Amino acid sequence: MVALIQRVKESWVKIDGTEIAKIGKGYNILLGVMKEDTTKDIEKLIKKIVKLRLFPNESGKMDKNILEVKGSVLVVSQFTLAGNAKKGNRPDFTAAMPPKEAKELYDHFCQKLSLHLPVQTGLFGAMMEVGIINDGPVTLILDSKKL
């Protein structure tokens, strides 16, 4: 499971021009679910996300976690994080979990994360417009297999 985490001042999701989710200070997380992922990958990612110190303290050093700054999270499904562009010019997405199973893990991830933080979500599988006002910018890629 891959989570692309961006520290944001604000983030939102629109579908067909209608805003369906919005957060203020926190993280925009683009989540890619891979074929071999399980609930153990969810547990590893959430443990790391909640404790990551990506917010500045009083002297500007990244030393505070999202709980300490009372931040929120916007989670958006992103199967293209499974893309491989090693061969040719069209990415190969065969590493992505099939949609039905991926939606189950995506929903489980969002539900488990919401036990720790306020969580908003995009709509799994939909074409979305995702707005992000980066803070920093600070962007981190977490791969559950490497945690």
From Swiss-Prot:
InterPro entries: Daa-tRNA_deacyls_DTD, DTD-like_sf. Keywords: Cytoplasm, Hydrolase, RNA-binding, tRNA-binding. SUPFAM superfamilies: DTD-like. CDD domains: Dtyr_deacylase (cd00563). It is an enzyme of class 3 (hydrolase). Signal peptide: none annotated. It is found in: Cytoplasm. A motif (Gly-cisPro motif, important for rejection of L-amino acids) lies at residues 136-137. One of its GO terms (molecular function) is D-tyrosyl-tRNA(Tyr) deacylase activity. GO terms for biological process: D-amino acid catabolic process. Its EC number is 3.1.1.96. GO terms for cellular component: cytoplasm. Its main location: cytoplasm. Gene3D superfamilies: D-tyrosyl-tRNA(Tyr) deacylase. An aminoacyl-tRNA editing enzyme that deacylates mischarged D-aminoacyl-tRNAs. Also deacylates mischarged glycyl-tRNA(Ala), protecting cells against glycine mischarging by AlaRS. Acts via tRNA-based rather than protein-based catalysis; rejects L-amino acids rather than detecting D-amino acids in the active site. By recycling D-aminoacyl-tRNA to D-amino acids and free tRNA molecules, this enzyme counteracts the toxicity associated with the formation of D-aminoacyl-tRNA entities in vivo and helps enforce protein L-homochirality. PANTHER family: D-AMINOACYL-TRNA DEACYLASE 1, D-TYROSYL-TRNA TYR DEACYLASE. Belongs to the DTD family. A Gly-cisPro motif from one monomer fits into the active site of the other monomer to allow specific chiral rejection of L-amino acids. Homodimer. This is D-aminoacyl-tRNA deacylase. It comes from Nitratiruptor sp. (strain SB155-2). The gene is dtd.
